[in-house]
Amino acid sequence: MFESVQGLLDEHDSIQAQLGDPAVYADQRLARKLGRRSAQLNGIVEAYHRWEGLRDDLSAAREMAAEDPEFAAEVPELEASLETAAAKLRRLLIPRDPDDARNVILEVKGGEGGDEAALFAGDLLRMYTRYAESRGWKTEIISATESDLGGYKDVQVAVKGSSNDPAEGVYARLKFEGGVHRVQRVPVTESQGRIHTSAAGVLVLPEVDEPEELEINQNDLKIDVYRSSGPGGQSVNTTDSAVRITHLPTGIVVAMQNEKSQLQNREAGMRVLRARILAHQQEQIDAANSEQRKSQIRTMDRSERIRTYNYPENRIADHRTGYKAYNLDQVMNGDLEPVIQSAIEMDEQARLDAIGD
């Protein structure tokens, strides 16, 4: 059992040796890559040694129990501990998404429902911001278009963590949030007290660590400048500070107008563009590799309804995992971990099943 781990143990030893060489840090890109891989392997190495120690302890206990019945009571306990350790190790050996350790750019856009959808988009932004705070992550609004009533027609926020451990990475925790989030409640604009249904779309993009990591040919870019506009379309700037960047090979378009200068908007736009191109490239790899199992619950498609937030019943329901709870008020205040964990566990189980096939 776990014969394949030896190769990972050898790789871990090799990486530790490299990280112990000061010369490695002259290449920061390589050092970050080695650091991320080391963090991923650390958990596997620790889990394997735990399993290996319990296996040896169980073998010794069985030998002693054969000679002295008093030791027999230890055998069932060690068997249970060994099975638990084996299950943990099996999960750690599931091939991880290569982007799990990355930070993310989270996009929330009001969908059908007009002003109410924009208000709900703002509620989702607050939910994610508070969840990020609970995990010690930092958030930064990159771009936002506010609605007349104070919500968001669309907003982009960068979420940054501090752990190199892929299992604790921002993308690993948030990547299943992409899709349509539907809300059922009485809008603030509703005078008759009727419940309305509206929606907001969420997109989660893994962020490129450094610009050099993803080379973009400047000849592949079309850059347009125009004047910024605020709620209602009124001009908020007398200079052409807003920027629209089109990546011609992929057709990806990013518009940015939050910053005061054209240069700042261009830098922010390129940051988002790199994230979108990285996600686009990964989608192409997934599509080209017929043997790679696509995630059953992660989507880059805003049109797939993934969750319903029912305010009158204080209920939240995830349509992919079957998760349901009546603590919507707590969820909207950032208590999102059980919902997210249900998606992670479903994905892990699907990956385990695929390995067993």
UniProtKB/Swiss-Prot annotation:
Keywords (A to Z) from UniProt: Cytoplasm, Methylation, Protein biosynthesis
Keyword Cytoplasm found: yes
GO CC field: cytoplasm
Keyword Cytoplasm listed: yes
Transmembrane annotation, as ranges: none
SMART domains associated with the record: PCRF
Chief place where the protein resides: cytoplasm
Description of post-translational modifications: Methylated by PrmC. Methylation increases the termination efficiency of RF1.
PROSITE patterns registered for this protein in UniProt: RF_PROK_I
MF-aspect GO terms: translation release factor activity, codon specific
Pfam family membership, one: PCRF
Subcellular location: Cytoplasm
N5-methylglutamine carried by residues: Q234
Gene3D superfamilies xrefs: 3.30.160.20, 3.30.70.1660, 6.10.140.1950
InterPro entries associated with the record: PCRF, Pep_chain_release_fac_I, Pep_chain_release_fac_I_sf, Prokaryotic/Mito_RF, RF-1
Family note: Belongs to the prokaryotic/mitochondrial release factor family.
Function: Peptide chain release factor 1 directs the termination of translation in response to the peptide chain termination codons UAG and UAA.
Protein name, UniProt field: Peptide chain release factor 1
Protein source organism: Pseudarthrobacter chlorophenolicus (strain ATCC 700700 / DSM 12829 / CIP 107037 / JCM 12360 / KCTC 9906 / NCIMB 13794 / A6)
